[in-house]
């Protein structure tokens, strides 16, 4: 039985250099290889012309460069593209490309499903199977870059920003997310600015502290409720890490980070008559008074079976004005890709659930019903 080959997309620069040392090669050779992979999108060792033939043969014998395949894609009327990415065992995760005038953002998944059970999110309703590997995370960027047109002659890449806001909670897959983000930031990797790579979390506080010790990237935090009572229902991880504990962790991260320019982005989904009252706006503003932030209000994007509705424009406008009265910077997110179920909270994929999600779902729906009445 032949030995399983090493997928080089699983290795950040430190691990790549360790591999090359094991091959008896100098560190700069590892850097050359990474440049071929991430700057020029090359997966065939024979195309790497500044690497000698003997080393190319060694690499071909022991290693491979394999990204997950695109199973299908849908294009929105606004230019957004949703990709279904095959990750084995008949499962798919979803990745979303969002073009804008001054940037091109890829929304990347970190898990096959999600274990956090946020009640307004389509991904959570699919259950959870496993964490994505490093190669499956960076492979989303690599594969979509090829789809969009990797410029092999110049190294120009079609993706300028990456947001870890796809399927899954990134901080529950820290062992793979950290090296994947290292590759995104590395000069020999995707070479993205730390301000152009954003991680979004619902509040796994110990892992947030570990992230701050390991990396400096932009941070977005999913708050979604102005108090623990409501957040316990909307974002159940709040029962383990309540708001004040989460906010303290956010402030510790800000103190370590340059990428955030002294503040984080607060994400707040607008659910009709659930968390969008004027009183709740005052409550949110007071909650955030000691945490430097800008607030991103996200109109809820419905999905089949959801118990929630989208807040009206007038309610969103009133909520926004209250926050601004407290001196907060407020942005109402423009919905992109909702006609192809690619908008925030709509990603679902194809998941083999390993949790008892469906049994719990009925209990959550009962809680929501009580809150709405």
Curated annotation (Swiss-Prot):
Annotated ranges, domain Radical SAM core: 100-339
Disulfide bonds: 107-344
UniProt-listed GO biological process terms: rRNA base methylation; tRNA methylation
Binding site for [4Fe-4S] cluster: 114, 118, 121
Superkingdom of the source species: Bacteria
Subcellular location: Cytoplasm
The protein's required cofactors: [4Fe-4S] cluster
Cofactor note: Binds 1 [4Fe-4S] cluster. The cluster is coordinated with 3 cysteines and an exchangeable S-adenosyl-L-methionine.
Predominant subcellular localization, coarse grouping: cytoplasm
Catalytic reaction list: adenosine(2503) in 23S rRNA + 2 reduced [2Fe-2S]-[ferredoxin] + 2 S-adenosyl-L-methionine = 2-methyladenosine(2503) in 23S rRNA + 5'-deoxyadenosine + L-methionine + 2 oxidized [2Fe-2S]-[ferredoxin] + S-adenosyl-L-homocysteine; adenosine(37) in tRNA + 2 reduced [2Fe-2S]-[ferredoxin] + 2 S-adenosyl-L-methionine = 2-methyladenosine(37) in tRNA + 5'-deoxyadenosine + L-methionine + 2 oxidized [2Fe-2S]-[ferredoxin] + S-adenosyl-L-homocysteine
Top class in the EC scheme: transferase
Keywords for the protein's UniProt record, in alphabetical order: 4Fe-4S, Cytoplasm, Disulfide bond, Iron, Iron-sulfur, Metal-binding, Methyltransferase, rRNA processing, S-adenosyl-L-methionine, Transferase, tRNA processing
GO cellular component terms, semicolon-separated: cytoplasm
One GO MF term: 4 iron, 4 sulfur cluster binding
Function according to Swiss-Prot or TrEMBL: Specifically methylates position 2 of adenine 2503 in 23S rRNA and position 2 of adenine 37 in tRNAs. m2A2503 modification seems to play a crucial role in the proofreading step occurring at the peptidyl transferase center and thus would serve to optimize ribosomal fidelity.
Family: Belongs to the radical SAM superfamily. RlmN family.
PANTHER family: 23S RRNA METHYLTRANSFERASE, RADICAL SAM CORE DOMAIN-CONTAINING PROTEIN
Other notes: Reaction proceeds by a ping-pong mechanism involving intermediate methylation of a conserved cysteine residue.
Name recorded for this polypeptide: Dual-specificity RNA methyltransferase RlmN
Annotated organism of origin: Shewanella sp. (strain W3-18-1)
Lineage of origin: Bacteria, Pseudomonadati, Pseudomonadota, Gammaproteobacteria, Alteromonadales
Protein's gene: rlmN
């Amino acid at each position: 039985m032949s030995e399983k080959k090493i997928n080089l997309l699983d290795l950040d620069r430190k691990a790549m250099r360790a591999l090359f040392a094991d091959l008896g090669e100098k560190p700069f050779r590892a850097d050359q290889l990474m440049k071929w992979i991430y700057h020029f999108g090359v997966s065939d060792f024979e195309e790497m012309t500044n690497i000698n033939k003997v080393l190319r043969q060694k690499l071909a014998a022991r290693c491979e460069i394999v990204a997950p395949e695109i199973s299908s894609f849908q294009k929105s009327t606004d230019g957004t593209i949703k990709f279904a990415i095959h990750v084995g065992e008949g499962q798919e995760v979803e990745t979303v490309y969002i073009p804008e005038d001054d940037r091109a953002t890829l929304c990347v998944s970190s898990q096959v499903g999600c274990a956090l059970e946020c009640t307004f999110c389509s991904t959570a309703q699919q259950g959870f199977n496993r964490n994505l590997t490093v190669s499956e995370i960076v492979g989303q960027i690599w594969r979509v870059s090829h789809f969009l047109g990797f410029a092999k002659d110049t190294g120009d890449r079609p993706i300028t920003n990456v947001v870890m806001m796809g399927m899954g909670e990134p901080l529950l897959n820290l062992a793979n997310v950290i090296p994947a983000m290292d590759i995104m930031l590395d000069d020999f990797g995707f070479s993205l600015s730390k301000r152009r790579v954003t991680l979004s979390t619902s509040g796994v506080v110990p892992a947030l502290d570990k992230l701050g010790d390991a990396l400096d990237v932009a941070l977005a935090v999913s708050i979604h409720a102005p108090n623990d009572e409501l957040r316990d229902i909307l974002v159940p991880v709040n029962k383990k890490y309540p708001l004040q504990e989460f906010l303290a962790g956010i402030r510790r991260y800000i103190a370590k980070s340059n990428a955030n320019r002294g503040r984080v982005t607060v994400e707040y989904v607008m659910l009709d008559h659930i968390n969008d009252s004027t009183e709740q706006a005052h409550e949110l503003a007071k909650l955030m008074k000691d945490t430097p932030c800008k607030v991103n209000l996200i109109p809820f994007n419905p999905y089949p079976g959801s118990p929630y509705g989208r807040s009206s424009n007038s309610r969103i406008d009133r909520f926004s004005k209250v926050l601004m009265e407290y001196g907060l910077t407020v942005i109402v997110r423009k919905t992109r890709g909702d006609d192809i179920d690619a908008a925030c909270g709509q990603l679902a994929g194809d998941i083999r659930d390993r949790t008892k999600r469906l049994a719990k779902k009925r209990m959550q729906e009962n809680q929501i019903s009580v809150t709405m009445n």
